[in-house]
Amino acid sequence: EYRANSGISHNSDLRHITILEEAHNILKPNSVGQSGEGGNVAAKSVEMISNAIAEMRTYGEGFIIVDQSPGAVDISAIRNTNTKIIMRLPEENDRKVAGKASGMKDSQIDEIAKLPTGVAVVYQNDWEEPVLCKIGKFDDENISSSFNL
């Protein structure tokens, strides 16, 4: 009702970003150690958070879901992302989860374990295939001066 009366469109421009670091802590896969009543509550919580992330994007909220182990994150949260940035993943299950979510072939998925420091696989849902990208070293002094921090 507020949006209808205020003239805000259903697909607002990005206004805010929330970073979910170590996302597996709140977006655990539904099958991991969840049995009985507690499991139902935990699974429902993950479902509600994933749904909220999907809905809040419409209102200009962006989410960055970060985890060193994509296999420890609920697959619905991974599917719900548009851009995936994958750096070296030594664990096979993590490579498969991230690689399949990025439209990679099995031979490409194996190569994720061999990526050098600073090289990432980048994929967006409307791309035909993922690309390799060199990521520059983080320079916090440059960032601080750019944003007057």
Describe the function of each predicted region:
Residues 112-116:
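C-terminal lobe/lid and adjacent interdomain/linker elements of RecA-like ASCE P-loop ATPase modules
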Residues 118-149:
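Conserved P-loop NTPase motor module
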Residues 1-111, 137:
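Conserved P-loop NTPase motor cores
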